[in-house]
């Protein structure tokens, strides 16, 4: 709606201007401070300019009123125009708020957890954010592909194999073992050890078979990770292996050398990242010739940046903050625009239950498993709470609040609005088709404001995507639900003289809730279950 109104105003003003959304919808639906920017050029006060501009909008079908207030130009949308937009939305509900196909393309890499164990709650936040960003981008018309980078090489995978070997020796073969400083523990390791022993037999468990054992376990963990994601309604397009980039390392090093991005010192090869804003240079090839994790990651990012996407987006844990300058430096040395590599950081999550820290999983050792939380509160509540705050801010929540059936549980509160609307239609014995001819002229000021809010969803979605601020969607839904409940409690619907107008208004509110929830990966309920 905002873009339509912007274009209507531009036809008359014939210049560029900012269109704002005033908080108080009783004053205006939209406003522009254009008069202030024209004051110097026209040598007039903003109040006079705004008054002159307002006179140009007399008898415009879109607007109920256009007023000059303190130098601002305030617009109120007419009921007739809002009704036209409502008819379009209700006639084609599946297309409501959808964007036209755009040329801009994105590649999102997210989750990319080491395949050494099940996903924990820290992984879940980035996973939910990435999946919602994907749904939103595709809804708005962008080409948006997703990828999971599988770290299937290096020490972490070896440690997985070693941990299983030691578990077999200790728990099954009853040998005395000495655990290294770093190893994987938890019931899932014991389960893998038992399964591996049954599959491979006693003779297999020796030092030389650790790589084979690690590969077998890594594949099992990857299946488990995909199941964890699926449980939260998350599907990633493709999984790419770190190992698949081994052969491209030398060519990447040559390219970096050509562009003076690397140098040799102390028997190692260093990335000259300090030249590009990093705090120091970074080792990418060790003295023994083995590449560091950074080396493999540079090769992978070089490939991603070469695939022709307008922008590559990564979602990383907040502990990777210091990794950003070195990766951007490498991309610049390789001839790419580092602005086309966007990093979104997912901050830490603190989980409580009845005000106390949530218990760690015995299965995972010292982590809270994503699957445990989904099993306890459901994927809808998990997704909502992870989207309720900006991704790069710390999130603390008590899962007990998400099990309550009152307004303190936002998922329940919003769903109650959606279910309430279905209940009202059932009570009236009507369907949406029965109220399509209603012209909405009888709506009072609060009703018009509620209708405007429901129809304003697309502007919220565009803002959320462009700013990567997905919390704008749950914020919008909370306000919409609160305003709906207030309006419902203050106005008689079934049996009233303007029943059809109110039912049509409510159907728009329900459509906005259902659409926004769908983009968040949440099901809008038609009936509340107790």
Swiss-Prot record:
GO terms for biological process: arginyl-tRNA aminoacylation. GO terms for molecular function: arginine-tRNA ligase activity; ATP binding. It comes from Campylobacter jejuni (strain RM1221). Signal peptide: none annotated. It catalyses: tRNA(Arg) + L-arginine + ATP = L-arginyl-tRNA(Arg) + AMP + diphosphate. PROSITE patterns: AA_TRNA_LIGASE_I (PS00178). Its main location: cytoplasm. Monomer. This is Arginine--tRNA ligase. GO terms for cellular component: cytoplasm. Its EC number is 6.1.1.19. It holds the Pfam family tRNA-synt_1d. Keywords: Aminoacyl-tRNA synthetase, ATP-binding, Cytoplasm, Ligase, Nucleotide-binding, Protein biosynthesis. Belongs to the class-I aminoacyl-tRNA synthetase family. SUPFAM superfamilies: Anticodon-binding domain of a subclass of class I aminoacyl-tRNA synthetases, Arginyl-tRNA synthetase (ArgRS), N-terminal 'additional' domain, Nucleotidylyl transferase. CDD domains: ArgRS_core. It is found in: Cytoplasm. A motif ('HIGH' region) lies at residues 113-123.
């Amino acid at each position: 709606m905002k873009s339509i109104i912007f274009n209507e105003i531009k036809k008359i003003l014939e210049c560029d201007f900012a269109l704002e959304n005033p908080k108080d919808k009783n004053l205006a639906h939209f406003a522009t401070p254009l008069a202030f920017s024209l004051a110097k050029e026209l040598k007039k006060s903003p109040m006079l300019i705004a008054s002159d501009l307002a006179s140009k909008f007399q008898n415009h079908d879109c607007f109920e009123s256009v007023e000059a207030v303190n130098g601002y130009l305030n617009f109120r949308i007419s009921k007739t125009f809002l009704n036209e937009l409502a008819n379009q939305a209700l006639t084609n509900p599946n297309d409501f708020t959808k964007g036209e196909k755009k040329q801009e393309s994105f590649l999102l890499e997210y989750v990319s957890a080491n395949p050494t164990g099940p996903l924990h709650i820290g992984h879940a936040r980035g996973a939910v954010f990435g999946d919602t960003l994907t749904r939103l981008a595709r809804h708005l018309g962008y080409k948006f592909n997703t990828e999971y980078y599988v770290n299937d090489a290096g020490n972490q995978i070896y440690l997985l194999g070693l941990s299983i070997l030691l578990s077999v020796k200790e728990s099954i073969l009853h040998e005395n073992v000495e655990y290294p400083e770093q190893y994987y523990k938890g019931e899932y390791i014991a389960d893998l050890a038992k399964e591996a022993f049954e599959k491979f037999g006693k003779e297999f468990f020796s030092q030389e078979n650790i790589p084979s054992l690690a590969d077998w376990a890594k594949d099992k963990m990857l299946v488990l990770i995909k199941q964890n994601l699926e449980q939260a309604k998350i599907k990633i397009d493709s999984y790419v292996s770190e190992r698949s980039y081994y052969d491209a390392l030398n060519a990447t090093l040559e390219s970096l050398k050509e562009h003076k991005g690397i140098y040799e010192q102390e028997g190692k090869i260093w990335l000259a990242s300090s030249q590009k804003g990093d705090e120091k240079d970074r080792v990418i090839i060790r003295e023994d010739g083995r590449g560091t994790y950074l080396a493999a990651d540079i090769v992978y990012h070089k490939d991603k940046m070469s695939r022709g996407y307008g922008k590559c987006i990564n979602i990383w844990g907040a502990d990777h903050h210091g990794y950003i300058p070195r990766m951007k430096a490498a991309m610049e040395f390789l001839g790419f625009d580092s602005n086309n590599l966007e990093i979104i950081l997912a901050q830490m999550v603190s989980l409580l239950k009845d005000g106390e820290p949530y218990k760690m999983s015995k299965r995972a050792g010292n982590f809270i498993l994503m699957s445990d939380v989904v099993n306890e509160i459901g994927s809808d509540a998990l997704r909502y709470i992870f989207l309720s705050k900006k991704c790069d801010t710390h999130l603390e929540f008590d899962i007990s609040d998400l099990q309550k059936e009152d307004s303190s549980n936002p998922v329940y509160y919003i769903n109650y609005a959606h279910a309430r609307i279905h209940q009202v239609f059932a009570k009236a014995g009507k369907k949406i088709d029965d109220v399509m001819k209603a012209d909405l002229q009888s709506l009072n000021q609060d009703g018009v404001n509620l209708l405007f809010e429901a129809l304003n969803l697309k502007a919220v979605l565009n803002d959320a995507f462009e700013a990567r601020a997905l919390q704008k969607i749950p914020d919008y839904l909370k306000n919409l639900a609160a305003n709906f409940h207030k309006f419902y409690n203050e106005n008689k619907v079934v049996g009233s003289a303007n029943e059809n107008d109110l039912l049509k208004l409510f159907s728009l509110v329900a459509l906005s809730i259902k659409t926004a929830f769908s983009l968040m990966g949440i099901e809008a309920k038609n009936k509340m279950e107790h």
